């Protein structure tokens, strides 16, 4: 192998080319590679954060769903209790109103019975006086007639 000026010239040119590349070409390529590597790392970190956030969101949504179901069940239970309470109150009011109406009706019946008894006593007294007049053949004066009817009504 002969070392001549061409080989030395080519070596010097290659060395200059390498220096030129190291000085002007290599730094932007390295910077671009580092920037790309940083973007990829940031993207992976963002993807990991997004995956964790998604998992937390799923857990939070599940928790909120469970809480909403529990709250809905509690509201339904309270509504059932309130409905039963309203039914019981209505039943008690109806019973009280029924007893009041029954007592009022009994009082009216008692009052009507007493007035019928009084009317019957007066009629019986009048019939008795009329019968007595017919039997005796004479008329009793009005004052005596009234006293006799009152006395007879009191006895009956």
UniProtKB/Swiss-Prot annotation:
Classification via Pfam families: ATP-synt_B
Keywords assigned: ATP synthesis, Cell inner membrane, Cell membrane, CF(0), Hydrogen ion transport, Ion transport, Membrane, Transmembrane, Transmembrane helix, Transport
CDD domains with a match to the protein in the record: ATP-synt_Fo_b
InterPro entries the UniProt entry points to: ATP_synth_B-like_membr_sf, ATP_synth_b/b'su_bac/chlpt, ATP_synth_F0_bsu_bac, ATP_synthase_B_chain
Transmembrane segments: 12-32
Gene Ontology CC terms: plasma membrane; proton-transporting ATP synthase complex
Recorded topology in the membrane: Single-pass membrane protein
Source domain of life: Bacteria
Region forming the signal peptide: none
Claim: Ion transport is one of the keywords in the record: yes
Main location: membrane
GO MF terms, alphabetically ordered: proton-transporting ATP synthase activity, rotational mechanism; proton-transporting ATPase activity, rotational mechanism
Compartment annotation: Cell inner membrane
Oligomer status and interactors: F-type ATPases have 2 components, F(1) - the catalytic core - and F(0) - the membrane proton channel. F(1) has five subunits: alpha(3), beta(3), gamma(1), delta(1), epsilon(1). F(0) has three main subunits: a(1), b(2) and c(10-14). The alpha and beta chains form an alternating ring which encloses part of the gamma chain. F(1) is attached to F(0) by a central stalk formed by the gamma and epsilon chains, while a peripheral stalk is formed by the delta and b chains.
Family: Belongs to the ATPase B chain family.
Function in brief: F(1)F(0) ATP synthase produces ATP from ADP in the presence of a proton or sodium gradient. F-type ATPases consist of two structural domains, F(1) containing the extramembraneous catalytic core and F(0) containing the membrane proton channel, linked together by a central stalk and a peripheral stalk. During catalysis, ATP synthesis in the catalytic domain of F(1) is coupled via a rotary mechanism of the central stalk subunits to proton translocation. Component of the F(0) channel, it forms part of the peripheral stalk, linking F(1) to F(0).
PANTHER family reported in the protein's UniProt record: ATP SYNTHASE SUBUNIT B, ATP SYNTHASE SUBUNIT B', CHLOROPLASTIC
Name this polypeptide is given: ATP synthase subunit b
Organism: Pseudomonas aeruginosa (strain UCBPP-PA14)
């Amino acid at each position: 192998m002969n070392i001549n000026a061409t080989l030395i010239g080519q070596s010097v040119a290659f060395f200059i080319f390498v220096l030129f590349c190291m000085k002007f070409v290599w730094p932007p390529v390295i910077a671009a590679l580092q920037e790309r590597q940083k973007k990829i790392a940031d993207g992976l970190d963002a993807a990991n954060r997004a995956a964790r956030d998604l998992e937390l969101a799923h857990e939070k949504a599940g928790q909120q769903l469970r809480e909403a179901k529990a709250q809905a069940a509690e509201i339904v239970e309270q509504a059932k209790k309130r409905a039963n309470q309203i039914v019981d109150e209505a039943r008690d009011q109806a019973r009280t109103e029924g007893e009041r109406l029954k007592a009022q009706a009994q009082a009216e019946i008692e009052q009507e019975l007493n007035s019928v008894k009084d009317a019957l006593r007066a009629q019986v007294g009048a019939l008795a006086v009329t019968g007595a007049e017919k039997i005796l053949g004479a008329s009793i004066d009005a004052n005596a007639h009234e006293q006799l009817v009152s006395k007879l009504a009191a006895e009956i």
